[in-house]
């Protein structure tokens, strides 16, 4: 009980010290006292409650803010470019077009007849008799394909203008003597120049598809085999093969993969001149009109031989070179002697001159190889046959149509 009374005064002293207006001194770790950092909010409010004053410091701005650096090691790595997703490889279907259509050119050479449908011509005439003045007319000056008969024209005049014989003109128009002409009548002349025309044309090649493309076969190589044979890489065997007794030797047959090239030496073959104009295609089957040697060949020059001369003996048979109809048989044309003209079709005529005797008549149908005359020397000084082939009224080389001996 005494202890309780003793402690009571001590407690009051402590309480009175805590409620004083002055803060208690604070001692630091060294035991030195220092005034308190807590100050009143308002100096006049001495009696108010004490609150600690929070000193406001402005935060640094973003620009002045120091960012702590992180410690890292740079990695040497090349930048990678973004790549597109891989596309699947294109595989063409069997019908897919592999190549586009192409255009190629090729050279075409053909023999054509250069004809003029009609031609206006002034014929110099005698003012008194209206007869043609041949001294002022050039033979063959008319180049038309047809001719319209004018007043005073004769068959001789028209043939002279066209540069052909009267009988040929009559044969072309199916006329017979005495050749009566009417004003305005149109005669077929067929005075065409035969020439070779070379042109270049474009050929469009179709597109090649996988389904239509033809695979290229590998080249066939050969190795020596037994008995002189050659064994091909494709299994074919060529060369001599010894046959067994009682059997026939097999004949090698060329397959599609083997190309057989043969060289034939013909002592009688005649070299072909590449500069000679190719013959015009003919549906007439020709044969030699007689046997013998050619003593004078064809010439296309002015004044040249318009056919071939074949030697022979008097009375030797002269035959029709092809089937046709006799359109002239006589000796009215000077320089030809006994002459026969055969019309084979609308394009081709053949002529047989200098005959000793004529065995056929005008308008007679003859067969190829039929005897039509006997060889002679009429109109010339030697026994021979002068033979001509005419295409559309123009002389062509008979040798290029006749079969080789």
From Swiss-Prot:
A cellular-component GO term for this protein: cell outer membrane
Signal peptide region: 1-17
SUPFAM superfamilies the record matches: Duplicated hybrid motif
Main location: membrane
Residues linked to a lipid group, S-diacylglycerol cysteine type: 18
LysM domain boundaries: 145-189
MF (Gene Ontology): metalloendopeptidase activity
Matching InterPro entries: Cell_wall_metabolism_enzyme (IPR050570), Dup_hybrid_motif (IPR011055), LysM_dom (IPR018392), LysM_dom_sf (IPR036779), Peptidase_M23 (IPR016047)
Region (Disordered): 81-102
Keyword annotations from UniProtKB, A to Z: Cell outer membrane, Lipoprotein, Membrane, Palmitate, Signal, Virulence
Gene3D superfamilies cross-referenced by the UniProt entry: Glucose Permease (Domain IIA), LysM domain
Record lipid sites (N-palmitoyl cysteine): 18
Subcellular location field: Cell outer membrane
Low complexity biased stretches: 81-94
Topology of this chain in the membrane: Lipid-anchor
Function: May be a virulence determinant.
PANTHER family (UniProt xref): MUREIN HYDROLASE ACTIVATOR NLPD (PTHR21666:SF263), PEPTIDASE-RELATED (PTHR21666)
Family: Belongs to the E.coli NlpD/Haemophilus LppB family.
Protein name: Outer membrane antigenic lipoprotein B
């Amino acid at each position: 009980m005494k202890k309780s009374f003793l402690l009571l005064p001590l407690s009051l002293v402590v309480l009175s010290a805590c409620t004083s207006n002055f803060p208690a001194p604070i001692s630091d770790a060294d035991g030195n006292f220092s005034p308190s950092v807590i100050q009143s909010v308002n100096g006049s409010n001495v009696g108010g409650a004490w609150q600690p004053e929070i000193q406001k410091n402005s935060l640094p701005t973003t620009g002045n803010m120091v960012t702590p650096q992180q410690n890292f090691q740079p990695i040497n790595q090349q930048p990678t470019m973004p790549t597109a997703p891989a596309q699947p490889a294109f595989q063409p279907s069997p019908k897919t077009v592999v190549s586009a259509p192409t255009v190629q050119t090729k050279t075409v050479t053909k023999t054509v007849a250069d004809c003029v449908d009609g031609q206006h011509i002034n014929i110099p005439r005698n003012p008194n008799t209206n007869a043609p003045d041949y001294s002022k007319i050039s033979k063959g000056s008319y180049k038309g394909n047809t001719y319209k008969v004018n007043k005073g024209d004769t068959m001789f005049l028209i043939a002279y203008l066209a540069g052909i014989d009267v009988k040929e003109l009559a044969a072309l128009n199916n006329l017979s003597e005495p050749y009566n002409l009417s004003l305005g009548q149109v005669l077929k002349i067929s005075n065409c120049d035969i020439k070779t025309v070379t042109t270049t044309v474009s050929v469009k090649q179709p597109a090649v598809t996988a389904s239509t493309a033809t695979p290229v076969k590998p080249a066939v190589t050969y190795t020596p085999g037994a008995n002189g044979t050659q064994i091909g890489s494709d299994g074919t065997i060529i060369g001599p093969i010894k046959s067994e007794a009682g059997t026939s030797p097999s004949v090698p047959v060329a397959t599609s993969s083997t190309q057989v090239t043969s060289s034939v030496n013909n002592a009688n073959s005649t070299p072909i001149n590449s500069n000679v104009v190719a013959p015009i295609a003919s549906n007439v089957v020709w044969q030699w009109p007689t046997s013998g040697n050619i003593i004078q060949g064809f010439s296309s020059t002015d004044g040249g031989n318009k056919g071939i001369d074949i030697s022979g003996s008097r009375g030797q048979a002269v035959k029709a070179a092809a089937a046709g109809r006799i359109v002239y048989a006589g000796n009215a044309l000077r320089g030809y002697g006994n002459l026969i003209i055969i019309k084979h079709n609308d394009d081709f005529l053949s002529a047989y001159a200098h005959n000793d005797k004529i065995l056929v008549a005008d308008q007679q149908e003859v067969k190829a190889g039929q005897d039509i005359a006997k060889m002679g020397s009429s109109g010339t000084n030697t026994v021979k046959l002068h033979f001509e082939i005419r295409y559309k009224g123009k002389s062509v080389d008979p040798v290029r149509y006749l079969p080789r001996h």
